[in-house]
Amino acid sequence: MYIVQIASECAPVIKAGGLGDVIYGLSRELELRGHCVELILPMYDCMRYDHIWGLHDAYRNLEVPWYGSSIFCDVFCGWVHGRLCFFIQPKSSDNFFNRGHYYGALDDHMRFAFFSKAAMEFLLRSNKRPDIIHCHDWQTGLVPVLLYEIYRFHGMDHQRVCYTIHNFKHQGIAGANILHATGLNNDSYYFSYDRLQDNFNPNAINFMKGGIVYSNYVNTVSPHHAWEARFSDISCGLGHTLEIHQQKFGGILNGLDYEVWNPEIDPLLASNFSVKTFGDKAKNKQALRERLLLETDDKKPMLCFIGRLDGQKGVHLVHHSIYYALSQGAQFVLLGSATEPNLSKWFWHEKQHLNDNPNVHLELGFDEELAHLIYGAADIIVVPSNYEPCGLTQMIGLRYGAVPVVRGVGGLVNTVFDRDYDQNHPPEKRNGFVFYQPDEYALETALSRAIALYKDDPVAFKTLALQGMAYDYSWNKPGLQYVEAYEYIRA
């Protein structure tokens, strides 16, 4: 198949979060399966040009209809670690992608509406006719709308669209001016509940809703999160829309890049290890203790948290887990940063308060090298999220022999299976500890079981860690599932 991914990110050249990693990992897996994959991306001024090989002109002066007139673009082509990427650069006083950042501008809706329009115009004018157009999140939610309402009448009538929702919290809610800009000119037609009208604000359109309504297949990034999106408020008002379109809606778990996250060859570890050489994991623990000036005591399990310090990640439970671990004779290492000033101030205060404690270290910020070493060193990884569409932290922890303690939400449900209580997996397939209520008591019940197993039965704890390492959370299975979805909507 010929597949074109249209997205606002692709790691490592454009990466603001996990979306970029998914775009790159999925594209590579699809190519390994023999498919032709191309990517269309914005040409941000702040992207990592050093990761692009052979950047050159692909299409000069692409004319993109806009507000009854036109904006001209140049399209550049280059290779990003083996992926063929096209970058759209508008020549306009609006400077849509020359802002010094990827997101956060007041006119983000206009910026990405234009990107969607330009991507479709590029496919049309360059005579590219992919079998599948795969779009991601609200930024490209208008692509299937434009394809169906405009471009199918210009020879693009056999393309099928897969639309993946990575985060329901950002949906692209905008006014009617977006419709006029992109050439979707019949307000009464588009401002209807079964098309683009926002489910909460009847005077606004919703990019993500448009993606759901007009695409041939819609998915989110784990099966359980797909269920949550339909039957809880986690979809932020789109639950009824998903119910209407339930026959084309599902969940496909994200994969993990096993070239980056591989304890057998990871150059950022103090000592590489595998299932067969699991004992060498302890050398990473010792190296981390020496680096962070922590006490050396092999009887103490090392717990860790790696991630953003915000409400989505269950920050109040992260904070509680630090003190609970210390009260149970364990060590705790945190690596993360808070974007909200009050949370940042709170954790800086905690860092100062705990600075002289030899069993805890709070590293506020992000350090890729340190993250790898923490994964390699940790015995237990804590993931107490309030909301987790997929989650990669627990997958990396499992890969590196760190037993996860997680809250049973989203993709955590599909990847971590409680050692004591999971009834859907035999004991030899269980790999962690799960709690469900978002409170301190529930967290403590799971943490206490994990810490007690480490202290009281080291052999059983090692067995559990090895069972986690045996799971395959690479892109292999998700890649196959996406191919099956593509083939289904092409049939």
Curated annotation (Swiss-Prot):
Q: Name one GO molecular function term.
A: alpha-1,4-glucan glucosyltransferase (UDP-glucose donor) activity
Name the UniProt key words of this record, in alphabetical order.
Answer: Glycogen biosynthesis, Glycosyltransferase, Transferase
Q: In which pathway does it act?
A: Glycan biosynthesis; glycogen biosynthesis
- Keyword Cell membrane among record annotations: no
Q: Which one Pfam family would you cite for this protein? A: Glycos_transf_1
**EC class:** transferase
Enzyme Commission (EC) number: 2.4.1.21
Known catalytic reactions: [(1->4)-alpha-D-glucosyl](n) + ADP-alpha-D-glucose = [(1->4)-alpha-D-glucosyl](n+1) + ADP + H(+)
Q: Which GO terms describe its biological process?
A: glycogen biosynthetic process
State where ADP-alpha-D-glucose binds.
Answer: K15
Q: Looking at the keywords, is NAD present? A: no
Q: Which PANTHER family does the annotation name?
A: GLYCOGEN SYNTHASE 2-RELATED (PTHR46083:SF1), PTHR46083
Question: To which protein family does this belong?
Answer: Belongs to the glycosyltransferase 1 family. Bacterial/plant glycogen synthase subfamily.
Q: What is the recorded function of this protein according to its Swiss-Prot or TrEMBL entry?
A: Synthesizes alpha-1,4-glucan chains using ADP-glucose.
This protein is called Probable glycogen synthase 2
